[in-house]
C-alpha cells in the first residue's frame, strides 16, 4: 500500500469510528466558550472554525460565545485609557464600555463570523443587545474585612450579570441552520450596556437552551489536583469537595463555578477544555480521548 493510500485508509478509519459519537450528538446543542490561546494562534483559529463547521455539517448545533479581554486591553492601551481590575473583573466606566462594545461587538465578533463563513459555515454575529438576547443588571460587588462592621459595596461600573436569555432568537437561528456567535455584552432595563464575563454568559446560554454540553476553552490542560495531575472526570459532588479543601482556588474558581452551575441547571455536562490542542473540540466529542476535565452528574467512563 502506498503512503498516500495508507493515509486515506487511516482517514476513512477515523471517520468510521466517529459514527457512534456523531449519532449521539445529532440534533443536540453544544455551547462553546471561545477564548484564550485558541483565539490568538492563526493555526488554532482556523482549526476552530473548521471544527465548528464540521459539527454543523453532521447535524450538531454549535452555539459560540467568545471573549476578548486581551484585545480590549490592547485598544485601551493604544487610547491611553488605564485598565483597572477588582477581583479579576475589569472596572468598566462609560468610556471603557464604549471600547468594550467596539472590540467585542465590532472587531472580535466579526472576525470569528468571517472565519467560520470562509470555511463553509453560516455564522451570524450577535451581541446581547440584539433582540435583547442577553438581559442583564448591574453586578454588585461587596468586600468585607474583619475590621468592618458592614460590607463595603464596590462600584465597578458597567459590569453586569445575566438575568435572562432570549432563547426564541437562538432557537430560530439554530433551526435555520445558522451558527450563532455571541459577544458577551448585556442590555439593561433602560437600554444600558453591560460588560459580562464570557464564561458566565456561555453557562447561562447553555442552561437556557438545555444544551447537551458546555465547553469552556482555556489555556490549561484541565483542572489539576494538588500533585499537578489532570482530573479528567468529576461529579458535581467531587467539585464541591475540591473547592472546600482548597484544591480549586484563585482564578479557576469562577470558571469552575460556572461549569458546575450549568450542570446543576440542566446542562448534560460541562468541560474545561485545553484550547491549545489542535482540534480539541473534535477530540472531545468524536473520540474517547479527553483533553480536559469533564464535570457531570456521573464520572467520565
Curated annotation (Swiss-Prot):
UniProt keyword annotation of Cytoplasm present: yes
Protein name, UniProt field: Acetylglutamate kinase
Record-linked InterPro entries: AceGlu_kinase-like_sf, AcgluKinase_fam, ArgB, Asp/Glu/Uridylate_kinase, Glu/AcGlu_kinase, NAGK-C
Entry's Gene Ontology BP terms: arginine biosynthetic process via ornithine; L-arginine biosynthetic process
Stated role: Catalyzes the ATP-dependent phosphorylation of N-acetyl-L-glutamate.
Gene encoding the protein: argB
Reaction(s) this enzyme catalyzes, per UniProt: N-acetyl-L-glutamate + ATP = N-acetyl-L-glutamyl 5-phosphate + ADP
Molecular function via GO: acetylglutamate kinase activity; ATP binding
A Gene Ontology cellular-component term: cytoplasm
Family to which the UniProt record says this protein belongs: Belongs to the acetylglutamate kinase family. ArgB subfamily.
Main enzyme class: transferase
SUPFAM superfamilies reported in the protein's UniProt record: Carbamate kinase-like (SSF53633)
Site (Transition state stabilizer): residue numbering on this chain: 33, 255
Binding site for substrate: 68-69, 90, 195
